[in-house]
Amino acid sequence: MKFAKGHGTENDFVLLCDPPAELRLTGAGVAALCDRRRGLGADGVLRVTAAAAAAAAGVLDRLPDGVAGDDWYMDYRNADGSVAQMCGNGVRVFAHYLRASGLETRDEFVVGSLAGPRPVTVHAADATGADVSVDMGKANTLGGGGEAFEATVGGRRFAGLAVDVGNPHLACLDPELSVDELAALDVAAPVSFDAAQFPDGVNIEVLTAPAAGVVHMRVHERGVGETRSCGTGTVAAVVAALAAAGADTGTLTVRVPGGDVVVTVTDATSYLRGPSVLVAHGEISEEWWQQAQR
C-alpha cells in the first residue's frame, strides 16, 4: 500500500491515494499508522479519493451539501482514528499532493469534505513544496445569547470565543498573555472544558493579542493533543482576535510553532493561505497493515 508523508506548518499527515475508495480504514489501523513509535507517525490520515466513489463505497452516507460527485474528497481521520469534518492544513497538503502526483493539473479546484466543499488555489507547486490558499467558508461564532465559554489549558483558566469552522473551536485570547508565557504553557497536558457545551469535543486555541498584524497561537486538538499547527484553528483565532478588537473582518498572520499562515476573514467567508511540504513517498507493509487493523 503506497503512502506519502507531508505537512502544513508542521501539522503532519500520512496520505493514502485511494481514488476508488476501496481501502478499508479502521480506527485501529489509522491510530497505528499515526503512532510515532509503532507506525509512520502523524497528526492524521488523509485518504485521497473522489466524492462519488466515497459515497458508493459507503465511506459517506451521502454527498455533503455542495460537494459534487466529480469533486475530490478528503477523507480525514484524526490520530486516534476518529473521523473529522475538516482540516485546513490537511486541505493544503491534499491539494499539493494532487498536483505533485499529476492527478490534478488545474490551479483552482474543489476539495470536498464532511464540512462541505473547500475551493483551493494552488499559487505555486513542485514535487516538494507548495503555496496554497483555501476558501474555508464562513466561520460562525456560537453562543450569541451571552453564553460564557471557558477552558483550562496547562493548569490555567481561559475565557474563549466558540467558533464553528466546519469543526468546533474554542479560541482563547488573553490580552495579558505574552509570547514567552504562551511558549511556556503546557498545552500538551490534558485540557478541560464544559462537555455540555461541546458534547463532541472541541479544539482549543490559546493566543496572544495581535501586535503588528501578528497573532501567536498554540493549539490542543481533539483526538490528537497538542499539534504544531491547526489550519481551522488559525481561522478561529483570527475571528477571536478581530472580535476582541471590535472588528468582523480583516487579515492577520498567525504564528504557530510550525510556521506562519495568513488568514483573511470577510463578511461572506474566510481564507487560509500557507505552505505545504511533501516529505516522503513509500510503501506500507501489507502484513503490518492487516495486523494493525485488528
Curated annotation (Swiss-Prot):
Active-site residues (renumbered): C87, C230
Residues binding substrate, per UniProt: N11, N78, G88, N89, N167, N203, E221, R222, G231, T232
Gene3D superfamilies xref list: Diaminopimelate Epimerase, Chain A, domain 1
Chain positions of site Could be important to modulate the pK values of the two catalytic cysteine residues: H169, E221
Catalytic activity from the UniProt record: (2S,6S)-2,6-diaminopimelate = meso-2,6-diaminopimelate
InterPro entries assigned: DAP_epimerase_AS, DAP_epimerase_DapF
Superkingdom of source: Bacteria
Enzyme Commission code(s) on record: 5.1.1.7
GO BP annotation list: lysine biosynthetic process via diaminopimelate
Localization per Swiss-Prot or TrEMBL: Cytoplasm
PROSITE patterns assigned: DAP_EPIMERASE (PS01326)
GO CC terms, sorted: cytosol
The protein's annotated pathway: Amino-acid biosynthesis; L-lysine biosynthesis via DAP pathway; DL-2,6-diaminopimelate from LL-2,6-diaminopimelate: step 1/1
Keyword entries, A-Z: Amino-acid biosynthesis, Cytoplasm, Isomerase, Lysine biosynthesis
GO MF term (any one): diaminopimelate epimerase activity
Pfam families in the cross-refs: DAP_epimerase
HAMAP family: DAP_epimerase
Family of the protein in this entry: Belongs to the diaminopimelate epimerase family.
Subunit structure: Homodimer.
Function (record text): Catalyzes the stereoinversion of LL-2,6-diaminopimelate (L,L-DAP) to meso-diaminopimelate (meso-DAP), a precursor of L-lysine and an essential component of the bacterial peptidoglycan.
Name of the protein: Diaminopimelate epimerase
Taxonomic source organism: Mycolicibacterium paratuberculosis (strain ATCC BAA-968 / K-10) (Mycobacterium paratuberculosis)
